[in-house]
């Protein structure tokens, strides 16, 4: 059994081919969204085990929760199927945790082969992450002590992300919940994978739904500060879309507040 286990949220897989495609070098779980319910295990030539858990359920949050339920590694890496891991990533991870043994979660860096993904930023230095600046980071590339997840009963929201009602945010809420439970979270510039994303499962442009969904997410994550976050977010996006002024963005996000109240 590997000390490190990669949990991949994926779609329409029929075998363990992703193990080689993603350059995996540890145990892995493929939480596979498709049209059947099945479970298979594959032993790799290097001795690692790949678990293929297929389900017809929809939503990336459900996928990630299934992977967590089957995980056995001391450290688990949340990953997407468009990631290609660098050689020796497991050693890089173990070295990082040995340097900061108090860490419950470390968010590593990714090298983007294109810049399709909106809002992703390269991390330039190692530092402690705080709640106020955590919303910009996703959990794909986050490495977490599995014991901390189980001890604190952490799971992903099934309302957000690809395949769910609202377009994104399940990973941001996971990190926020981790902070609320007292986990110590760090970020590091160490690259553990490359991303070759060419299309998004949720991002269809800066349309009305995008801003409404952001309002739903902010009302969930920061109920006491949601109005302040609206102005902050709208100011940052005011010149990005010619069809969405500062005031229109605020209006749409407040529609999201109302939707969240009625969930």
Model-derived features: where do they sit?
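Catalytic beta-strand/loop signature of glycosyltransferases that borders the donor
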Residues: 156-158, 182-194, 206-207, 226-229
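Short aromatic/hydrophobic "clamp" motif used to bind/position activated sugar donors
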Residues: 76
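Conserved donor NDP-sugar-binding/catalytic core segment of glycosyltransferases
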Residues: 88-121
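Acidic donor-binding loop at a coil-to-helix junction in glycosyltransferase catalytic cores
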Residues: 159-173
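Glycine-rich, basic loop-to-helix element that forms the pyrophosphate-binding segment
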Residues: 55-71
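Non-catalytic, C-terminal membrane-associated alpha-helical segments of glycosyltransferases
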Residues: 206-215, 219-220, 224-263
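N-proximal low-complexity "stem/linker" segments adjacent to membrane-targeting elements
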Residues: 1-27
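Short, flexible, basic/aromatic active-site loop/helix in glycosyltransferases
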Residues: 118-147
């Amino acid at each position: 059994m590997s000390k490190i286990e990669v949990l991949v949220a994926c779609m329409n897989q029929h075998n363990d081919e992703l193990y080689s495609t993603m350059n995996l070098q540890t145990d892995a779980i493929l939480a596979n969204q498709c049209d059947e319910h099945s479970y298979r295990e594959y032993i790799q030539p290097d001795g690692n085990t790949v678990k293929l858990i297929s389900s017809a359920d929809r939503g990336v949050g459900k996928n990630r929760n299934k992977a967590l339920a089957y995980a056995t590694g001391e450290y688990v890496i949340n990953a997407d199927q468009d990631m290609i891991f660098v050689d020796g990533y497991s050693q890089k991870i173990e070295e990082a945790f040995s340097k900061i043994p108090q860490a419950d979660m470390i968010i590593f860096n990714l090298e983007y082969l294109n810049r399709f993904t909106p809002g992703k930023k390269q991390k330039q230095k190692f530092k402690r992450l705080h709640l106020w600046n955590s919303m910009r980071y996703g959990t794909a590339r986050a490495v977490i002590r599995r014991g901390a997840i189980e001890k604190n009963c952490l799971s992903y929201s099934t309302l957000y992300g690809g395949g769910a009602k609202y377009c994104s945010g399940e990973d941001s809420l996971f990190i926020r919940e981790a902070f609320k439970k007292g986990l110590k979270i760090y970020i590091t510039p160490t690259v553990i994978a490359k991303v070759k994303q060419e299309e998004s499962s949720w991002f269809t442009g800066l349309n009305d739904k995008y801003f409404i969904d952001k309002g739903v997410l902010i009302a969930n994550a920061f109920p006491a500060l949601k109005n302040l976050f609206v102005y902050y977010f709208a100011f940052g996006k005011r010149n990005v879309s010619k069809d969405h002024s500062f005031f229109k963005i605020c209006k749409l996000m407040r529609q999201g507040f109302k939707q969240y109240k009625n969930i």
